[in-house]
Amino acid sequence: MKKLLLMILILFSTLSLAVEPMPGVNFKTTKNTISTESKNKIEVIELFWYGCIHCYNMDPYLDKWADNLPKDVTFKRVPAIPRKDWVESAKAYYALETLGIVNKLHEKLFDAIHKEKLFKHNDTKALISWITLNGKLDKKKVESAFNSFSMKAKLSR
């Protein structure tokens, strides 16, 4: 009987943990809102980093999910840049976007860094060379995308 009572007590004690989160207690709301590019639509933003193994592992699942979104939902990838050594991989993503080959090379770049271990995520020369080779582009065009004014604007957001 004591064991049964103890089991019931343990079982019901977890119910106290299932509480609705409260603003100011469990999380803080911000005064600033984030503007979206898709007005009147739900915008899902993935913050990722090419050096992150978890982002790499999650990417195929996100792609599948993004292929089947409702019409009122958009999906956008944004490279995270909390530290200086993450800037170069963010530049790589934005360069792929600028060059119009992000859909073709995004997954392959993840593979080159994590699966094939061809270079580090912050090796600018290697990233430019890899994009030039795999995008079948002129090296100066890729370098220009890496160093453009629009790149600086994207990085400062």
Where are these regions (language model features)?
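Extracytoplasmic thiol/disulfide redox context detector
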Residues: L4-K84, S156
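Cysteine-centric redox/oxidoreductase cores and disulfide-bonded domains
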Residues: P82-R157
